[in-house]
């Protein structure tokens, strides 16, 4: 019985999240009502409240799951406590989950903060050759990657993930970020 209930709960949450991600593309979060959401998800209002306190709780849970997804994407690197410069993995994930990432940007979720806890200063120093202003270089890089991802999503991810890596590398004068 619990397996059936768990499957139902997961399916309900999936419907709610899907409806939310569709609505957030055309509305601001404060304009989305539970009524709109349950109507689009084709579920009962009580089903929503079994899973979430309100729309903001739903958004928070989505953000938390997004962060977990990114951590899982780089699980091996997290275990080794070493930053990964494998942006191809990230761009492939974004292309496969476009509405998810569009939703996160719409909710102002700064998933680039992932780098704050994983970026290795030693690697950045090797790349730049100095510790002078390293914090500024790192912030500039994070903002640049974030802007490129937003632009790519707005354009419908027309370019391949491989082309996006080429664009990033060209911004760094062909230098590989891996050293």
Could you describe each region identified by the protein language model?
Residues 1-23, 27:
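Basic, helix-initiating cap at the start of DNA-binding domains
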Residues 79-120:
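Helical hydrophobic small-molecule/effector-binding pocket
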Residues 22, 26, 32, 62-86:
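Amphipathic alpha-helical linker/stalk segments
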Residues 42-52, 145:
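Short hydrophobic/aromatic patch on the recognition helix
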Residues 132-155, 159-174:
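Hydrophobic alpha-helical segments that form the core
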Residues 107-143, 177:
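Amphipathic alpha-helical packing segments from all-alpha helical-bundle domains
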Residues 31, 54-59:
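Short amphipathic alpha-helical segment with a characteristic S/N-K-E followed by hydrophobic residues
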Residues 16, 35-40, 48, 94:
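Append "Primarily bacterial transcriptional regulators
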């Amino acid at each position: 019985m619990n397996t059936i209930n768990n499957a139902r709960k997961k399916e309900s949450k999936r419907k709610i999240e899907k409806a939310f991600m569709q609505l957030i593309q055309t509305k601001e979060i404060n304009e989305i009502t539970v009524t709109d959401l349950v109507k689009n998800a084709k579920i009962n209002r009580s089903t929503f409240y079994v899973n979430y306190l309100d729309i903001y709780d739903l958004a928070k849970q989505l953000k938390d799951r997004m962060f977990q997804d990114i951590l899982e994407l780089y699980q091996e690197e997290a275990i080794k406590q070493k930053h990964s410069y494998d942006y191809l993995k990230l761009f492939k994930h974004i292309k496969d989950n476009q509405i998810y990432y569009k939703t996160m940007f719409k909710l102002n979720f700064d998933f680039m903060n992932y780098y704050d806890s994983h970026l290795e200063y030693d690697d950045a120093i090797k790349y730049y050759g100095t510790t002078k202003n390293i914090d500024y270089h790192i912030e500039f890089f994070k903002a640049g990657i974030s802007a490129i991802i937003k632009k790519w999503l707005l354009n419908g991810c027309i370019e391949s993930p491989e082309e996006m890596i080429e664009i990033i590398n060209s911004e760094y004068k062909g230098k590989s970020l891996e050293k």
